[in-house]
Amino acid sequence: MNRFNILGLGTALPPHAISQNGYATFAATVVAPEACDSNNMPGLVQVLYRRAGVQTRHSVLLASSSEDEATAERFFRRAKNIDDRGPGTAERMNRYELEAGRLAATAASKALADAAIDPEHVTHLVTVSCSGFSAPGVDLYH
């Protein structure tokens, strides 16, 4: 049986970020008011985001960084009506596929540097994303 070792780790984040509080404020504005059973939707969203344990959100969807404003976020727009659910799964996965390769390449370069080995010595690549997936995956990015 072959043994394996994790020789290097590399991570990458999108360049722009927003505070959790700032994104909670933005999230509360994109929900159609009539889609909620409560008049206190902004307050409920704030509680949900505060309890998530996240401090900062990095996103490829932000055109610039700001502590508390997501004004450059255009992918998720304010709901037009109660049936408007925003971008569908296909649209979100297309955006993921467009953005993920660059981040994966950055993380892979860092992992190779951390391992101090040449790429031709790598036999397996493990990737993790909390945002989406594509098939074939980011391992074919070039």
Show which residues each predicted segment covers:
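Short glycine-rich or small-residue beta-strand-to-loop segments that form or flank ligand, phosphate
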Residues: 95, 123-129
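Conserved "HGTGT" condensation-loop signature of ketosynthase/thiolase-family condensing enzymes
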Residues: 1-120
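A glycine- and small-aliphatic-rich helix-loop capping segment at beta-alpha/alpha-beta transitions
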Residues: 134-142
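Gly/Ser/Thr-rich loops at beta-strand to alpha-helix junctions
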Residues: 12-14, 129-135
